[in-house]
Every structure is written in structure tokens, then in C-alpha cells.
Amino acid sequence: MAAAATTSSHLLLLSRQQAAASLQCGLSFRRQPGRLAGGSSAPSVRCMAAVDTASAPAATEASKKSSYEITTLTTWLLKQEQAGTIDGEMTIVLASISTACKQIASLVQRAPISNLTGVQGAVNVQGEDQKKLDVVSNEVFSNCLKSSGRTGVIASEEEDVPVAVEESYSGNYIVVFDPLDGSSNIDAAVSTGSIFGIYSPNDECLADIADDQNLDQVEQRCIVSVCQPGSNLLAAGYCMYSSSVIFVLTIGTGVYVFTLDPMYGEFVLTQEKVQIPKAGKIYAFNEGNYALWDDKLKSYMDSLKEPGPSGKPYSARYIGSLVGDFHRTLLYGGIYGYPRDQKSKNGKLRLLYECAPMSFIVEQAGGKGSDGHQRILDIMPTEIHQRVPLYIGSVEEVEKVEKFLA
């Protein structure tokens, strides 16, 4: 009787365990004879994986589409490092830049509250009035790059000359940036942004420098090494401060878009391998300067206003912020242009830290960047704050303006 009870209990317990195991891990069971303590036989269980080929792909697909699965910028950078696309130093530099962008985003959003609107009272090297946020954003960007310990030289729109941030330049990256593009619109809460590009150090810039205020020969060589064509860029991107904070990045393998999640304080991947349309019906030019343009450019602009095969002319969209206008062009197609004119003989935008990074991004997305005659990325800078005309956007649209200007 006791033996029967023991057998019954064992079978009940065994059946419950089998059921639980089957539900939890989808395994199949095969009963084999075994022995109980009393000498009677009892079934034992052999566990084998049961593969349902029909449901496996569906399960994999479901896991990919999980609404709770997110990829942060940090995770994405680590994956790129593991794949050998970038090294550990580049990962740290890009993480530092993203931190700077988060801080600047907060400053921009709170600018009216923190009394950061208006003019600082100083003039930068370009002869432009510095906004309060220009100065603060430049300091934030510079400090984040310095604290990374992986940046050798930085060149900013707000600095007269490149700044050495480490005792030794060997193996450290060169970062060029505009800390706050479109700052003239900040008082009106219009979209602004930060632009950056990352270069590898030049072989001529591999020595320690003396700690003095004057530029010695080594520093001069390092400054020269900053002036590289955009074709040498290793990474480029921008962060747009608007209704959302958008971080756009390329490391030479396509264009990726990350959106700042205010709940977690993390940039989250929202678009991969962005491709700009081959053509577009939107143009972004400051037509207030029309009278200052040459006749060829006027003819081009007039052609955009004529009804095309569809019976509709191009649409004009101009924010006055390079980052804002470029981001729309990247997503919708079309062309953004800031040409030379009678007032600005070489254009207004800076080659090193505005035109080159944006052109690198647009080419990675299948678009084109030109000064009207040649590829932006092929132009060798002769000085840090060199200006060039810029026509950037869909391939067909940029080639169209090049034909008019030829």
C-alpha cells in the first residue's frame, strides 16, 4: 500500500514537472522504464529538444519587432567597435560629442529661462556678433572633448586657431565643429544645431608641445594637419535641436539617425541607412540676396519657379539654419544652397566644419555636395575658417545647378 502510494505520488509529481517543462521550453519527452525505491518500475523521462521549423522564423521575427527592443547610441557604437568598423578611441570621442549635444539641447530649451538669449557683447573671428549660447555651447563642446582624453586638436567656429587639448598628439583624433549653427535664430526658438567632423592625426603632428602661449613649430604643424580635405573624414554628424533632439551620424557605412528619449536621457536609433531621394521639388535658398547673384544663378532660380512636367513649380522652404534646412533636404530630397554673391565673394559657410561634414553625410546617403563646380570633399582647405559656396542635396538637383553655373 505504501509502495503504491509512493508510486502514485511520484507519477503525479512527474506528470506536473513534465507539463511545466513542456510549457516553458518546448521540449519533447520520451518515457523509459526506471526503478522506484520499492523496486517497482516507473517511467523516467528523457529530454530532447523539439524544433518546430514553422514557428522558429516567426518567433525570430517577433523578437525583432518587439516594441520594447531599442538600440541606444552607446550600444550601437559598441557594436561598431566589436565589428572593427571603429576603434575604442573613436567610440569614446563620439560618446563625448553626444554628451555635449545633450547638454547643449538642455541649454537651448531653457535659454529664455536661464537668460541665455541675446548677444554676448563680443565678436568672433568671423566678425559676427557672438550670442550668449554661442560662447556657452563652445565651452561645453570643448570641455567634453578635452575630458574624453582621446582628442588631440579641436577647431571651432568660435576659436581663432585650433586648440591643443592633450600633452601629446600621437594617436589622438582631430575634431572640427560648429557648436551652435543657426544661433542667430535662437531668440525666436527656431531650429538650431551642432555640426562636427572627425579626422585622424597627420603624421607630421606626433610630438609633445611646450606649455607656452606662443605657437611653436610643432603646434604650427598640428594646425596645418587640421586643414584636410573632407575626403579624409572618418566620421561626421550633426545634432538638431528642434521639436525633437536628433543626432545624425555617419562613420562611412551609411547614415544613421538617433532621437533623444527624454525619459531615459539616451539617444535611440530611429532610422538606419538613410537614403536621400535622387530628385526633389524643394529648394532652400535665401532669395533675399537674389539681386546680388550673378546672371547664371538667377537663371537657375527662375527655372525652378516655372511649372515642370507635373505642372507645378518647385516649393521654397528656407529656415535660415543649415542644420534644419539640410535635415529636411536629407529626408525629402531637393537642394539647399548658399551661393557666393557680391557681398560674400566666397560664400558664407565654412568649408572645414560646416560644408565638408555635411557633404560627407549627404554622399553617404546617396546625395551630392558641390561648390557649383567641384565636389566639396575634394577641396583642400588653406585656412581654418575658409568659406566656400555650397549646393547640397539630391544628385539630380545639384547636377542641375552645376550645369547652369558651368
Swiss-Prot record:
Pathway(s) where this gene product acts: Carbohydrate biosynthesis; Calvin cycle
UniProt-listed Pfam families: FBPase, FBPase_C
Residues that coordinate or bind Mg(2+) 1: E128, E157
Domain of life from the UniProt record: Eukaryota
EC number: 3.1.3.11
Cofactor remark: Binds 3 Mg(2+) ions per subunit.
Descriptive protein name: Fructose-1,6-bisphosphatase, chloroplastic
